[in-house]
A protein has these predicted regions:
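Flexible loop/turn connectors
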Residues: 232, 236-339
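Amphipathic helical "hinge" segments at domain boundaries
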Residues: 46-110, 206
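N-terminal helix-turn-helix DNA-binding module of bacterial transcription factors
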Residues: 1-60
Length: 339
């Protein structure tokens, strides 16, 4: 069996240097890191994580907590890119990730509690932000390091790191662009749930619609196509009225995909009958017919920053490494808002 000493000998460095490379120590030169990793590949050497856990009392794993149904999350490009960004950063520093997903809060709490008590992870990243979140309170009570992807929702939240976009400003930018194309009425379609991202995007939408004296309505629905179909069917006559210029803005790309499917079935043409726009750019919005105007909120960058932030907390062995990191966004204008 190849040992760390074998790697060190062939690479011409000390075993402690090899160990630091495995742990992702940034004080080692890129040349040394590259050389050690090359030798590890040549010798087919893999670190014994179980032994390392016993010695260091660390698991070198980060727990990722997602609130929602497993299938929609697995198919959602936003979460895929956030998770990719987190994994990239963690892997560079010798950490892995362990994900737990559930739409049931009690099940999610049980799983997180088990991960804490069985010492399965060293810290957590919550991939959502919600008021009065019992999981967040559990992590505080158990003195577990964690950060949140999303905005602070209370005074106590400002004691912890949050990675977010300015969703109010992003929604204002998108709504303003749509209005500038000429509209009489606006519809904002959102999912049910008390999540901060939804509140902020609705707030930005309402602010700009009100400032421009545009009639608007907000529809709360589920991601289920049948429910969306019923809403759109009730609006069909109005959406087809050539004397009323209308636009639909949706909360995110997955909900938007269901809306586009329903509009197609109802023979409502985009952008002729109604303009459409959304948030969370991906291949779903880029290759849609027609391609959809959207706000790119840089999910991979969100994940990378989240990974860096939680590792920084672990490195300094203190939760009080507090940051509020705002990731930039970009408006991508496509045919769905070009009449």
């Amino acid at each position: 069996m190849v040992t760390i000493k074998d790697v060190a000998l062939k690479a011409g460095v000390s075993p402690s240097t090899v160990s630091r490379v495995i742990k992702g120590n940034q004080r080692i030169s890129e040349a040394t890191i590259s050389k050690v990793k090359k030798v590890m590949e040549e010798l087919n050497y893999f670190p014994n994580t179980a032994a390392r856990t016993l010695i260091t009392n660390q698991t070198y794993k980060i727990g990722l907590v997602l609130k929602g149904s497993e299938e929609p999350i697995r198919l959602n490009p936003f979460y895929i890119n956030v998770l990719l960004g987190i994994s990239e950063t963690c892997n560079q520093h010798g950490y892995g990730t362990q994900t737990t997903v559930s739409n049931n809060m009690n099940d999610l709490m049980d799983e997180v509690y088990k991960m804490i008590k069985q010492r399965m992870v060293d810290a957590f990243i919550l991939l959502y932000s919600k008021e009065n979140d019992p999981i967040k309170q559990m992590l505080i009570d158990e003195s577990m390091p964690f950060i949140v992807i999303g905005k602070p929702t209370s005074d106590i939240d400002h004691q912890f790191t949050h990675i977010d976009n300015d969703n109010i400003l992003a929604s204002e930018n998108l709504t303003r662009h749509v209005i500038e194309q000429g509209v009489d009425e606006l519809i904002f379609i959102t999912e049910k749930g008390n999540f901060e991202v939804s509140k902020d995007r609705i707030q930005g939408f309402e602010t700009i619609a009100s400032q421009n004296k545009i009639n608007y309505q907000i529809i709360e629905t589920s991601n289920e196509r049948e429910v969306i179909f019923n809403y759109m069917q009730n609006l069909h006559t109005r959406l087809k009225d050539p004397n009323i210029k209308q636009a639909i803005i949706s909360l995110d790309a997955m909900l938007h995909l269901a809306i586009l499917s329903v509009l197609y079935e109802l023979n409502i043409e985009i952008p002729k009958d109604v303009m459409t726009a959304t948030f969370n750019d991906s291949y779903l919005t880029e290759i849609a017919s027609p391609p959809q105007t959207c706000i790119d909120i840089k999910p991979r960058m969100l994940g990378q920053q989240a990974g860096a932030a939680i590792l920084n907390i672990l490195k300094n062995k203190a939760q009080d490494v507090i940051e509020l990191v705002i990731i930039d966004r970009e408006l991508k204008i496509r045919k769905s808002t070009q009449r």
